[in-house]
Amino acid sequence: MTADSPIHGSAMLMMNSGRVLSGHPCIGSWANYGLGSVNEDLPGFVVMLDPRGGPISGSKNWSSGYMPATYQATVMRSGRNPILDLTPPSELQGNSQRQLLDTLRNYNEDHFATRSDNSNLAARIASYELAYKMQTQAPEAVDISQETQATQEAYGLTDPKSEKFGRQCLLARRLVERGVRFV
């Protein structure tokens, strides 16, 4: 692979956004913008980080750039628990979590009414709702123990050399099957 820049950080941005400089939407953000998500309980665009660390230029690689922040990626960690805090705290059982989120949304929407040009605030409001919805869909989507032993072997999960990469490939397949447009 080649790029217009010999500098790895700029080349990564070029690969992901088509531009050498940051501030432009990446391809996943464009897909999320143009196609949306098939499943409203899961994000439309997911990034899975390499277990050895994030890429050069970090989150600029999955940024929504000048588009509203709601189109940026949802990051999933590598390993056995790709999404933290999927289970609500014990003190928020029953309807209390929904009531808390509704109150928070009302405050945020009041705040947003005077700052409608702030897409980060709109994205924050949307992310709270998505996180709430993900509590029902995501645990099943990321539970690869439901796959047969043959499938786990085919993805290399039984070999320490390929287990981490295989886990991400299998997780990506499961997410796409459930409506995530871009991984």
Task: For each feature predicted by the language model, list its residue ranges.
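Ligand-binding pockets and gating/stacking loops
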Residues: 1-183
